[in-house]
Amino acid sequence: MPEIPDITESELWIVDTTLKERYGEKVETQIADAEIRLMPSDRDLSSCPVVYWNREGCNFIIFKTGSRKYRCQFFYRGYQQYGTGVHEYDDLTECIVSLLQAQADHAAKERGDL
């Protein structure tokens, strides 16, 4: 299995810029590693780099699963995990914008606005 490349400075710039546009201020992000199954049939977990941030009680994570391959989810508690409905993105900007929109829609639905 090919090694998954680390998150690049340009990818971090995309995340930071998108979050600043969304929230109107700099959002602290963290780089970490996570172990996930890249394919549902995989028995072994693969280590992949992630970008994580927390905003207003919601946790966001973007997994880099390969060169120009990204997955994402947001969660409030371990048992409250949500995604965008797209398994994997080949464009980081589309991934993060879709993630932020899915969370905003979820929050609006929870408030009864949708």
Annotate each PLM feature.
Residues 21, 31, 60-61, 97:
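Amphipathic alpha-helical interaction segments
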